[in-house]
């Protein structure tokens, strides 16, 4: 069996013809960044990242309304992890699929999700946008979860007097916020003038 046949399995089980299934499979494989030249490869000859892409494509070929992904980047290197998550975000945008991402990586969660639900001992502890959930970083720690590293850095900078938003959860947000704070501080220093002895 090859990759294309593997991905055709779901649509064919839904009653689609071989041609329809192949069309859906090819579309799904290309959407997850799987190159056409690899369609005829054996699934056993694929890298870890390629296998994850094929698995996601197999589900996408069935045109789901909701896609549940449990630790989809486990075992991948940082580059592969970012590629998979970028493609998942693109699928949400292009296809309008609701994606439920189960992850212990709070950096990934902060960067990619619109809504964050934290479950602790089978009960929902938090359900809000990431910024609001990560504001409770001390409670998250008590549950065995850490907020993104940038959350801790921003809180430390705020405590040291830098006028930043401690609710920043991504590196990009923090970078913009820190640059803005430094410009404001520099502007204040220039307005006040520098006294020489």
Task: Identify the function of each model-found stretch.
Residues 56:
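Hydrophobic anchor residue at the start of the ABC signature
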Residues 20-37:
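Conserved ABC ATPase "signature" region
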Residues 121-122:
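Conserved ABC ATPase "signature" C-loop
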Residues 42-46, 50:
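Conserved ABC ATPase signature
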Residues 63:
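Conserved catalytic motifs of ABC-family nucleotide-binding domains
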Residues 109-111:
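A short, surface-exposed alpha-helical micro-motif characterized by mixed small hydrophobic
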Residues 67-70:
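Catalytic Walker B motif of ABC-type/P-loop ATPase nucleotide-binding domains
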């Amino acid at each position: 069996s090859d990759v294309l046949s593997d991905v055709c399995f779901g649509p064919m089980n839904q009653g689609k013809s071989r041609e329809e299934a192949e069309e859906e499979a090819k579309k799904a494989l290309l959407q997850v960044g799987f190159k056409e030249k690899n369609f005829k490869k054996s699934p056993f000859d694929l890298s870890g990242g390629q296998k994850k892409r094929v698995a996601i494509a197999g589900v996408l070929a069935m045109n789901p309304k909701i896609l549940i992904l449990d630790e989809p980047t486990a075992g991948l290197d940082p580059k592969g992890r970012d590629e998979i998550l970028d493609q998942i975000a693109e699928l949400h945008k292009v296809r309008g699929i609701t994606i439920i991402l189960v992850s212990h990586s709070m950096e990934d969660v902060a960067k990619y999700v619109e809504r964050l639900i934290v479950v602790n001992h089978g009960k929902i502890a938090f359900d809000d946008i990431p910024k609001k959930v990560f504001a409770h970083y001390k409670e998250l720690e008590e549950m065995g979860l850490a907020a993104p590293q940038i959350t801790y850095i921003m809180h430390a900078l705020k405590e040291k007097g830098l006028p930043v938003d401690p609710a920043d959860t991504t590196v990009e947000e923090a970078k913009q916020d820190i640059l803005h704070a430094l410009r404001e501080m520099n502007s204040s220093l220039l307005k006040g003038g520098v006294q020489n002895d």
